[in-house]
């Protein structure tokens, strides 16, 4: 009897071993692998025909640099039949090798491919300056070009383009959310409004990923938020956040208007669902009455009253906006819409130093009431990267960080700033076309120049 049981156990073990050996063989799972470069020179489409459903990843690397620089895709769900996975962040005209790993056990033969050339209109980038203590970073810079055909790009720390996409029109702004993998893009100019406003209003918005899939595309027109400008981003839960003009008629004859009704183009924001339904809207007019606000001339500024340029939401669900004309940062209650404080010369917060002047852009909430901005300093002749710590109850604020840029790296308008390390910041100076890596003491580590205009730029570790 014991001998019989032993034989049965041995047979089962041999059977399992045989099954294991089969499943360790890539040919057990797949029968065909192909790779192609199609409509985008820096996207490689790997098509695998699986015999059985499975999970798989693709590991790939640049031949010249070897496997030490390999990237691996996220885990993919492979269904029986043909499956496609797209490889991204590739250099142009470069030889690569990849292998497919199925169920973390079976590995395919290695396959080589060659990427294509960049289209001639893709923006170019170059390193202008690198300090002696500069350490290479492995992330990528998101930048774009305001001219047609409207390319959004990622480049590496040396300015080499590794990703691009054309949107047909000049790119006004773009924002990538690494949590969702979504790219939010504003493109085109809104003609037919007036000479002042067409310069900032956009004609179309997109939400897409980095693999060529578009999830949302809509014209900025009646029926869908016709006056969008300056800022569009997706939140971590997939919603869409926009800066927009809000137009309201006022009787400004007491302020010098010649007619009874004047349209004032104020600003605010929209929060929308993934399919474009408005869930929340807010505008500035309850806080700033054009008739009563004496430090602004509402007749002269009617077509662009306070010029909002950014909107941000913090972890508590409250909002922050920057306004360029008045150089102010506002915090807005996410539930009531009340303005909780205003940091600026005409605001209600006292600051342990001079207030921002000559332009303020791109609020980033490092945490609630710890807000980073790019202070343009048109009246000073130099720009600053600033972080404010605001006490919303006492209405006081202090400078936590204040980085002064040299005049040649400053930008009198537009621009933005990021904190990308414990003591490392990225600053995009739009007017001079520079992407600047700098520490908290103002020591510049690297400067990358670009062709064309990129309203903002961002650094991401992928």
Give, region by region, the residue ranges found by the protein language model:
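Short S/T/G- and acidic-enriched coil/turn segments that sit immediately N-terminal to beta-strands
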Residues: 81-86
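Bacterial Sec-dependent N-terminal signal peptides
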Residues: 16-36
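Bacterial N-terminal signal peptides
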Residues: 7-15
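Surface-exposed, short loops/turns at beta-strand junctions within beta-sandwich domains
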Residues: 87-95
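Histidine-/acidic-rich catalytic cores in large beta-rich domains
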Residues: 36-43, 95, 102-462
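Aromatic/hydrophobic beta-strand junction motif of beta-rich domains
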Residues: 44-50
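Extracellular low-complexity, O-glycosylation-prone stalks/linkers
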Residues: 55-73
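Short proline/glycine-enriched turn/loop motifs at strand-loop junctions of beta-rich domains
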Residues: 50-55, 145-149
